[in-house]
Amino acid sequence: MNYIEGIEKAFKEYIGENSIDKLKETITKKPMILIAGDQLTGKSTQAKRLSEKYNGKNLSVGTLFREEAKRRGVSVAEQARLLKKERGIDVQIDYSTCKMIGGMGLDADLAVIEGRQPAFMGGFMESLGKEGLVRIYLGCSVREQALRFLKRETTKEDYLFVKEKLPEEDFENLEDVAKEIDKLDIPNTKSVMKAFIDNQNRDEDDRERYHKLYGFDYRDVEGYDVIINTTNKEVEDVAKEIIESIEKHDESWIERRP
């Protein structure tokens, strides 16, 4: 079963037999940029910049997740735990993502949607007739992810010290980079690194869930039109690289600049 069939099967089971017909009704000609990737790769930052560049709406799957938690009367953390054992919440969020990609009701000419699964939901919407999608994957090294987390959660002094001392290598996993940082013997770093691993493990949880439920791996670059490695790059340089890649992939985006 390919992922298109997997998504259709799940939607019919959890949303309803007429769910696909309802999705077709949401399809407009409004183009969409779909950004995916792990946490700390720059998705949110670049989505905001792209929406400003093309005068579009900046939308996030994370917002749908928070809205669903509020509707159910649970915390975001509790809902994340429920996803591990309760089917249906995630399918509803993915269905809402597809409606978002369709563009019906969007109060802008286009949108930039970021999350982990938008590109593959976009692939499903393309199978229903949606056009004008650009699917982008942002990635970076485990070392870079750890440094970005430290920059956010510790002092500037500690961050710069770790950045200078941490070996310039692409660590194989989260635990290896955490152990290397622990060796630097900085106060509170151990607890920060534990939080980093817990935070990043959500990516693996989601990856496993999407594969089991739909049959796709959101890290599979075959599902994307543009792939950007953000390691050791400034925000402005990444934005420039993304824009150039989008407009090379589809020249019509040049005309969409305000």
Task: Locate predicted features.
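NTP-dependent small-molecule kinase module
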Residues: 2-23, 186-193, 197-258
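Phosphate-binding P-loop
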Residues: 22-30
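Hydrophobic anchor at the beta1->P-loop junction of P-loop NTPases
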Residues: 35
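P-loop (Walker A) phosphate-binding loop of NTP-binding proteins
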Residues: 38
